[in-house]
Amino acid sequence: MKNEAATELMMHLQQLDPEISRILWANFDHRNPSPLSKAIQDARGISRQAASQILSRLVRQGLITEGAGVRPKTYEQQTLFTHSVTLPLDGLEEHVVWSEHFRPAFSQYMGEAALSIWEYGFTEILNNAREHSQGTEVKISSNIRAGCTSVWMDDNGEGIFKRISRICKLPDERQAILELAKGKLTTDPENHSGEGVFFSARAFDMFQITSGGLLFDHQDGEEDFLFERDKEKAGTLVWMAHGNHTQRTLKEVFDEYSMPDEYTFSKTVVPVKLARFGQEGLVSRSQAQRLLARVDRFKIVLFDFSDVETVGQAFADEIFRVYAKGHPEVELQPIHATPQIQQMITRATAMT
């Protein structure tokens, strides 16, 4: 009976309209039940009654369950598939783990674009744990719902931020997150390009790295965030989540950071706020130099000033006059700058 129920559930999921799957993911709250009727009405241009009929059918099929909310009515996505495995890192082959333990189920629950992103990101992050963590084992867990899939990879190694700080001789583990956000960072330049974590973070809808007392959070279309945690996390935990019927392709992710007619990683976005440690303001040349480390590896660098209200004159001058003059081959562009910040940049460039 259990196998029959699983087969029936699989059939319902395979027949699920991709648009409904995307609505479930876009309106899904990992912690609380979510109202869905209005989202379906707006997406489909249908009445509340018609949206309720769709939701009632999804409940009967076992794809979602009703939450406690009444006005508006709320729903939760059912977990349809889970799998967890703990493996030794020594001798591990990431493509074998993917193809034997996870791809068979993933391929039944999602579209080709999502599957391609999972194959890339899963194997890149697992390879990173195998070759760089200095750990002995990794635990991999997956959770598939009607709208989305999540994977956790938890190794018992040194910790990614601690390792980067040690090998790259950085003064603070928080700067390791800033360097990861730029891309082209590797602790083994002879064998790795430093692109795997960067592109994995941008391929998935949601991506988090937790290690030590820090958490790095990247969400598609949102700003990068750095959270400081009270509780230390040994090793490195990477969480990835992605819509089962995403319309974004892996090629589009790569193209966003490449020059036209080129196939190289030549463009990056630097979240300026990650150069700010604690409550400090961004006023000094040394803080600007945190941002500028290694940006000469790119042709175009976008400095994203989201969540930064103001900067000091020395900070702006170091980036947009001093560095720009010394590196004319690198195009520096500010984005999301406030009028005050733009004024500081204009003042700096006027002095060149």
Predicted regions: what they are:
Residues E232-A234, R294-R297:
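A structural signal for short secondary-structure junctions
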Residues D29, T65-V85, A129-K251, V322-A324:
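Conserved beta-strand-loop-beta-strand hairpin that lines the nucleotide-binding pocket
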Residues K2-T123, H132-G135, A146, S165, ...:
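Bergerat-fold GHKL ATPase/HATPase_c domain
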Residues F315-G326:
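Short, non-transmembrane amphipathic alpha-helical segments
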Residues F298-V311:
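Short, glycine-/small-residue-enriched flexible loop/hinge segments at domain edges that mediate gating
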Residues F199, R290, E318-I319:
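A short acidic, amphipathic alpha-helical/loop segment
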Residues D220, G312-D317, Q343-I345:
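A short acidic (Asp/Glu
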